[in-house]
Amino acid sequence: MRAARTKSMRIITLLAAIVACAHFIPFYILLTTSLKAKGDYSSKWIFPADISFHNFSEAWERASLGNSFINTMIITGFSALLLIIFGSLAAYPLARRETKLNKAVFALLISIMIIPPLTSMVPLYRMVVDAGMVNTHAIAIFINTAAYMPLTVFLYSGFIRSTIPKELVEAARIDGAGMLKIFFTIVFPLLKPITATICIISCVFIWNDYQFAIFFLQDQKVQTLTVAMAGFFGENANNLHLVAAAALMAMLPMVVLFLALQKYFIAGLSSGAVKG
C-alpha cells in the first residue's frame, strides 16, 4: 500500500515537472531573445554572454507602450474593483437565501457563462455606436465587468456556502446589525482568499483581452496593450529581439500580481471547491 502510494506520488511529481517545464521553456526563450543585442543570432537556447537592455527601451518607445499601459491599467483596475464589489454583494444573498427566485437567477448566471461573447458582439457594437461610447474607457470597463460578472458570482457563491458559518451571521443579526453592516464588517473580510483568486483571474483575462478592445477601442489614444502589441508585432515581425522585449514588458504586471497573491489564490480555489 505504502509502495503504491509512493509510486503514485512520483508519477504526479514527474507530471508536474513536465508541465512546469512546458510553461517555463517559452518564457526562457522569450527572455534570452530579448536580452540579445541587435545582430546576435546565436541559438535561442543559449543565454547571451553580453546582456543588452536596449531592446526594452527601444520597444517601449516604438510601440508607445507607456500610453497603452496606462489605458490597460485603468480598464483592468476599475473592472476588477467593480467585479469584486458588485459580485460579492450579488453572491451573498444567492448563497444564503435559497429561494426559487435566487435559484433561477443563479441558474441564469451559470447559463450565461457558456455563451461565447463573440455571438453578441455585432448587436453590442451597434448599441455602443448609437450611445456614442466607442473609444472610451467607460465602455471597456462596463463590457468587461458584465462579461466576467457571472464567473465572479459563481466563485463567490461557492466560497460563501463552503466557508462562511451561518451561526456567525445569525449572531450578528441577533445583536442588531443590519444586512449591509453584517456583510461589510463580518462576511467580506472573510472573503479574502476568494477575492484574491477573482482579482487574479479577472485581471489576467481583462489585461489580455483582445476581442473587446479591437472592436471598441480603435483610437490609438485609448488602445490597450493587446491591440498595441498586435500592431507592433506586425510591423516588426523580422525583429524578434524587439518583439520579445515588448512581450516581456506586457506580461510583467500580471506575473507580479500572481506572485503577490498566489498564497490566497490557492486557498481560494481549494476552499471554494470543498462544498457545492
Curated annotation (Swiss-Prot):
Gene3D superfamilies hit by this protein: MetI-like (1.10.3720.10)
Record-linked SUPFAM superfamilies: MetI-like
Membrane topology: Multi-pass membrane protein
This protein's UniProt keywords: Cell membrane, Membrane, Polysaccharide transport, Sugar transport, Transmembrane, Transmembrane helix, Transport
Disulfide-linked positions: none
UniProt keyword Acetylation present: no
Subunit relationships: The complex is composed of two ATP-binding proteins (MsmX), two transmembrane proteins (MelC and MelD) and a solute-binding protein (MelE).
Reported function: Part of the ABC transporter complex MelEDC-MsmX involved in melibiose, raffinose and stachyose import. Probably responsible for the translocation of the substrate across the membrane.
Name the record gives this protein: Melibiose/raffinose/stachyose import permease protein MelC
Protein species of origin: Bacillus subtilis (strain 168)
Organism lineage: Bacteria, Bacillati, Bacillota, Bacilli, Bacillales
